[in-house]
Amino acid sequence: MKSVRSFIRDDIQAMSAYQIADVPPGFAKLDSMESPVHPFAGHETLLQEWQARLAAAPIHLYPNPSGSGLQEALRSAFDIPDCADIALGNGSDELIQFITMLTAKPGAAMLAAEPSFVMYRHNAALYGMDYVGVPLNGDFTLNLPAVLEAVRKHRPALTFIAYPNNPTGVCFTRAEIEAVIEASDGIVVVDEAYGAFNGDSFLPQAGSIPNLIVMRTVSKIGFAGLRIGYAAGCPEVIGELQKILPPYNMNQLSLTTAKLALQHYGIISANIDSLKNERERMFAELGKICRLNTFPSQANFITIRVPDADLLFDTLKQNRILVKKLHGAHPLLEHCLRITVGSPAQNDAVLNIIRQLYCQPTDFL
């Protein structure tokens, strides 16, 4: 009798699953770019309104994302032009998956700068696309000549550009991204998962550039648990994407919460501004620490390079702080760690541990 595994694709069996760390109670979770606080905390009236709307949500019915009012709320909050259509996904991960499926003709290629979000490469492999990874410069800036040469040579059906980039936090220039879009015949997805922390966006151009899709998520602005992503682009492309997205792919409670949040976006924006201020404070303090390379960030995290990534990761973990160890994920990420910007107290705890390791004479580094 054949093993059940013999019916499973060999290439999938060779893959590794995305690992989500188990976080013991009481740990500061600074590994996944989540908000350190509930987005409605401190706003009692808004909390009461939220609870009332959740209680009234028709959870006995399948959701209708297109009729929920969320698309209109997104359009209003983020200045998405009327000429653009909007597709909603169960997190931007789902949109990455189905945009890849949309373009995965036999022999088609996907292009991305590296290191970047690991799910680009993962989905290319899942759908049989040739993957072209173009290394960044050593300071994590975009190697534009190399990217343009790869576009010319491989003619990718799909290109992903994270703006700002994850896991580095560095933001490529707008002119560089415009050059890639102009040089590409295929679809270019500008992934603005961290766009709220950047201050610039391609959303106003969505719908007017035929091969541009702009993708965002509510996860990084305080709503990671909702799993809502959205993609804006020309109706010709978004209409094709809508054909393959699963029906009822979002739930009533998430739709209700997201719509309410966008109707009170001033509160959410104030939370974002607080995190941006903490990011700048943390960046300045890290810059004072010797033997540390701190990369400029336009996201809600900071990436650093240290003499020994394992030592710092383990020391932080011993002190009940979890960060993301990037060392080993890509050659350019040697001895790098990514630290989510947390609360002031959490950030101070991280800074104090790093100072203890790198601002005192030691014999073991």
Swiss-Prot record:
A Pfam family per the record: Aminotran_1_2
GO biological process, one term: L-histidine biosynthetic process
Keywords, alphabetical: Amino-acid biosynthesis, Aminotransferase, Histidine biosynthesis, Pyridoxal phosphate, Transferase
Matching InterPro entries: Aminotransferase_I/II_large (IPR004839), HisP_aminotrans (IPR005861), PyrdxlP-dep_Trfase (IPR015424), PyrdxlP-dep_Trfase_major (IPR015421), PyrdxlP-dep_Trfase_small (IPR015422)
Reaction catalyzed: L-histidinol phosphate + 2-oxoglutarate = 3-(imidazol-4-yl)-2-oxopropyl phosphate + L-glutamate
Pathway: Amino-acid biosynthesis; L-histidine biosynthesis; L-histidine from 5-phospho-alpha-D-ribose 1-diphosphate: step 7/9
Organism domain of life: Bacteria
CDD domains documented for this protein: AAT_like
EC code: 2.6.1.9
Keyword Cell wall biogenesis/degradation set for record: no
GO molecular function: histidinol-phosphate transaminase activity; pyridoxal phosphate binding
Modification N6-(pyridoxal phosphate)lysine, positions: 220
Cofactor field: pyridoxal 5'-phosphate
UniProt family annotation: Belongs to the class-II pyridoxal-phosphate-dependent aminotransferase family. Histidinol-phosphate aminotransferase subfamily.
HAMAP family: HisC_aminotrans_2 (MF_01023)
Assembly behavior: Homodimer.
Name of the protein this chain belongs to: Histidinol-phosphate aminotransferase
